[in-house]
């Protein structure tokens, strides 16, 4: 693997050598590797994402698609690690390289660590700004993201029903909840590029604020309220339940900033359906 990485990096960053290559823990379906590449006196910290041995969820993007989406997002100013190179076959599996950035991703730390207090103050505005940029991406640049055949809300609800049916056992409270959603459909909005897992825990944060939006494998075309509501889910508050937006802030300023940037008029009450 080292030789293949060096061959690609010489074309991208110039003559040099891989001086460190270590696999990182975690990654149920994708391998994660830290790569250090030296060119003369400069050391380039990189991150390698490589296909693993299986697929956790059938609707995740292929690595080639995820890499292309990162390229588009980077080109349009979304805060993502700079994508550098895609490998169709790196020792038998596809992979891609990107810049390695420093910061914290573990949600329980983001919502509590004293040294991240300043970041928590700025995150609601920063999250709104990044979502506005993501939702402005042109679907024409990512044609592998196909529009849903049904209204986005209906497609999401039918998927929830399928997942519940697959459990093979009764869950009447969940059935009642899904029925309520079916009887109270939201207004339809035009589909946009949706990140699909936008929340604290998938945001790289340092002492000053948001560094990068990570983990794009669930991206799709859908309702923008999916991304607005997902970081409100209680599980993503990491014990700071009094702060509905990801354990770091309130929904009002976040949504107000998003609406101002996008020209949309989404009300906070609309997010309950998606949450």
Positions of predicted regions on the chain:
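Active-site activation/catalytic loop segments of kinase-like enzymes and analogous catalytic loops
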Residues: 226-263
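All-alpha amphipathic helical-bundle segments outside canonical DNA-binding/catalytic cores
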Residues: 147-148, 265-275
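Catalytic-loop of the protein kinase fold
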Residues: 193-195, 200
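Juxta-kinase regulatory segment immediately upstream of eukaryotic protein kinase catalytic domains
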Residues: 1-14
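ATP-binding pocket architecture of kinase catalytic cores
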Residues: 22-155, 162-176, 185-190
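Conserved protein kinase catalytic-loop anchor
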Residues: 191-193, 211
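Activation of the activation-loop gatekeeper triad in protein kinase-fold domains
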Residues: 214-219
